[in-house]
Curated annotation (Swiss-Prot):
This is Condensin complex subunit capg-1. It holds the Pfam family Cnd3. Member of two distinct condensin I complexes, the condensin I complex and the condensin I-like dosage compensation complex. The condensin I complex is required for conversion of interphase chromatin into mitotic-like condensed chromosomes and for chromosome segregation in meiosis and mitosis. As a member of the condensin I complex, further controls crossover number and distribution in meiosis by restricting double strand break formation, probably by influencing higher-order chromosome structure. GO terms for cellular component: condensed chromosome; condensin complex; cytoplasm; dosage compensation complex; X chromosome. Transmembrane segments: none annotated. Residues 1127-1144 have a biased composition (Low complexity). It comes from Caenorhabditis elegans. Gene3D superfamilies: Leucine-rich Repeat Variant. Coiled coil: none annotated. Disruption phenotype: RNAi-mediated knockdown disrupts X-chromosome localization of dpy-27, mix-1, dpy-26 and sdc-3. Results in chromosome segregation defects in mitosis leading to aneuploidy. In a sex-1 mutant background, leads to high embryonic lethality. Residues 1038-1047 have a biased composition (Basic and acidic residues). Expressed in embryos and in somatic and germline tissues in adult animals (at protein level). One of its GO terms (biological process) is meiotic sister chromatid segregation.
Amino acid sequence: MPPKKRIRGPKLPALREEKSTGTDVASDESFNESADFLNNEELNNDQNDAENTVLSEGVSTLRINENMTKEDRACISAALFIKKRVVESIRTVFQSRDDINDEIHTSSRKLIAAFKKADQNRKKKVDLMKVFLDEIDVRLSMIIEEVTVPEHRARVFKLIAVTITEIQAFKLPSDLLDFIINFINTWGHSDNVAARINTTCFISYIFETGKRYLTTEGEYSGFEVKIAAKMFLQLKRALLDKEQTARVPAIRGLGFLQEIPIPSNWPVDAMKHSPRELLLRSCRDTAWECRLVAVQSMVPLETDVRLLSDIVYYDKCLNVRVAALEQFSNLRPNKHVREKIEMLDLCLKDHEVNIRDAAKEVLKNWVRNLSTRWSESQKSKDSNDVVILNSNSESTTGEENKMKGYILAAQALTLLWLTGALETLEGHSNLRRLITHTLDVIRQMYVCQADPINTFAEVLISDLREKMKSSAVPIITKSTVGSILDDSELADTQDPSTNRAMIFFWRCLVDYISDRKRNDADKINAMSRFVSPLRTMVEHVEKILVRVKNLDVYPNISQRADYEDHTFVLQMSIVENIICVMRHAPTDQPGVDAYKQMLISMLMNVFYQKKVIDLIVQELAQFYKEDPNALFTLFNDRIEEMRSKYKSGQFPVIENSVPVGETKVRKDLEEETRKTGRRTISDKDGIAVIDLYELKVLNALLKTGILLGWSTTYQNRYNNKLREGISSKDLSTRVLCTECIGIGAIYDYDQAENTLREMMKSFNTQDEPVQCSLIAALTDIQIEHGDQVDALFSWNSKQPNFAVFLSDIVVNAHVSGECETMLRAVEAISRLFLNTKIDPNQQKWQRTMVTLMTRASYAITNRFSAKVRSTIIVMLKFFCSINKNNQLLLIKSFHNFFDMWANSTTPERLTENRHEMVTKLKRCAATFVALTRHSTLPLEEQKKCKPTHVDLVDDIFHEMAGAPDSTSVDYYICALNFVEYQSLSRSALTKIHGDLESYIFLHELDGDKHRYNELRKAHRKIAKILGLNEDEIEEVPSKTDLRKEAAPSKTNKRNANLISTDIAVDNDVNMEEDDKPGPSRPATVRKPRAPRATPASATKKKPLVEEDALEILKSPPRNTKKPPSRPTTATRPTAVAARTAPPRSARKLRSEK
């Protein structure tokens, strides 16, 4: 029944006591369906309760006397039975503590018995169905108006929902369902927040039980379409509630309905949005509680990867981000591989520990699921009847986990990730990092994370059983190295991509063992299980190279249209990873000699990629550290031998080299030949391949740093080639020549100065890779030779030196674009700051510092801008912790930084909302002041230098006195509150305290109290440190604060839009949302309590701790408040109970007065 105003009259007279004649009632067969009515003693005992029972008007006039008919007695007995069953059922469930599900099931049986009794007596003098529904109405109305002990109230709702479901299953009348629908519809429009919360929870339970137990065709969640549509529309209406606590149960209810198909005869109002669509839109709700429940309730699909990734990246609530990341565990890792790799890579590098832990949990679930599926596929038919006890419980000793095949699941993920990752150096580097985290997770799953790495290797070997080798891709171990790419049954059934994945995972596993070793003995013992001695490894690798060469005619991939390019990528990857494994092989003198000769023969292959050549040269350079000229001479002689032996397109074989990758190079030459109209490859084209190979090796040799000087021999041999290569049509040639000239200039700057000046004049017309190479080269030269590089800019008056040149690149770069040149310029400035002696008084360094500070304050719009900001902040943090002069450079740049933003014509670079300019710059001030704290310096610097914040305060006072009308002062003055006053001497604090008093008096009568408030905050902080008894003066609200207070409150609106706001792209710009729920309506305010006395602990002196402002620019302020926990039901949030009327017990007491 709907809530209504009950008119209470005088107290009813008590029923007269008369002799009971209950034998007639017990003999009536029409009311003997329940066993409770077969006991005459129970009927006699219940007659005493009849006196205190308030029934309907018809029943209350019936009295038990000798002249009463059997029908009248049965009516009263049935009414007592109904009341007793309803009260007992609801009371038992509400007060239950153990076996809650059993209690709900038993109580539902009692309610069904009472319902049947009322249904049988609906045609008697008194409609007992109305009595049954009134009792339900009274009990539910007492529960629905408040939300205290929510888990107990939820049990009652579950009880009614289960009862309705069973009544529907037994094909009984729908009186109870109709009554509940009317009850829900009425209370759903109540002004009471608790009533709306409980109503929505009630609907969710009804849908949940109907979906679970009723599967009738032509119905929706077990109910008729018309009835289900009413409840669905009620949930949809609840999504528009202004209270987030009332929207949460509605969102959870939609989670139960998201997988149920919408019927064709669904009403028009309900067909506008499906439950899943409404649930996904709730992921954008303004309240973090609603977003959290929406993410947790959704059943993720592969099409939701983009939505979940955006939530993980950009949501402002940490709990919501973690919940979205956990949903990836429910997705298969074999779809949208690249997006999932990027997401996990970023999460594993996130500064929040919870995000990193959740990402590792995703990896753990993927590994466990793969190993479980593999184990199930390996079970024989004879083992189906075996019952495994406690299969869900994890072993504490780890014995059961050592035969699970987790390591094979990790290799399967590696094969999957390699197919989706980018074939670039950065892509493979990120993938190796991801596999390293996966191995950490597997080590925990094997329960040996605290043991030496040798124990982990032993566990892996014991897990690789023979039946695993025959049915899955095997792990490469010491005993299987020689079978890589061999002509075996395994090689015939797998393509080269699988073999590449095996080798890649082998390399990652070996690197992991080397990094996680406790000592050399631990590493040697663990490595001996996966790598053979160096001499044996050389023999294996020589055979493997021949097999890699034969991949050019592999039958499984030769049918691809681009099989040459695909095979070339696989070949280079295999060779690269094998060389990386060779680094960890146990060495002996014969093995070292064989390894050196193998590297020389590999270096003579002109078809390798640049990354493979770099790797070979790095390994080979270790043998020529004492005599680098011998290596250069050997290389030059072999190049001349190649040129002399090259004939008619046939490349010579030098030092028994294996021409891996020749097919790809020949294909490119043939295509170039067809474009020019020639039939055969000319000698000029072949010589061009050798020349490019010479540049690659020369570049790799110079980067090793083993060369002692750029002698005349090298000048005569390479200078002309390098100058000609700068103007080449091939981009790779120009990049290689630029890098070589830059490295050569480090040894002899004079011989390369003119070439570098010509390149700088045409800098703007060069391609981006050439610009990046030139910036890196000039940076290395300036670090080595100082300001000599500035002479290259003498022709340009606007950019007189290298520092200004780099600053202009950073400033003029487009904000939204991803400019690689700008990123290299930022990195170059960072290297100059950290590797050169900086004078804080020089104008060029101040300008460069302002450029970095300005770029770091830009709004984050994508991953590229986040990378630029993190690079600058991390560099400045390290730079300012070296010495005092570095801190002075940052402090002297403060004025120009704030002056730039005060006169900026593009404030949207800082923030999209102009009204947040002061807030954003205040956060920037907090960050940059925190970087210059005196406590960040080494102890020796702290003792011999005074704090640089003294100079900062002097600069602020000078600016206030010199240009009081400047807008930059409003920003500059924000830095006062973040100064580390604790490190200042008492005399300095006393002087600052006195100066502040004069400025406070000067600005006391200002119209806008912003400056006055900022000065007062700093004044009180210093007074507290000095121990002065200063009267606490309240801050005067500024004009901005007054405008905020005058703005209309959002709580005046009745409904909130379902489509609220998009997830913020810039986390650092948007301020944290208000997570405090407001009242649903103006309620009576009780008198506040008297203020409590100050506890003794509060009177103790506490150390002054300032918030670390370095975290401000990294991420937005996080809400550390945890979401509401529900240990029992986990279904409803806690809401502020706002009653609209006294409780029924109070009304009853007033009516009896």
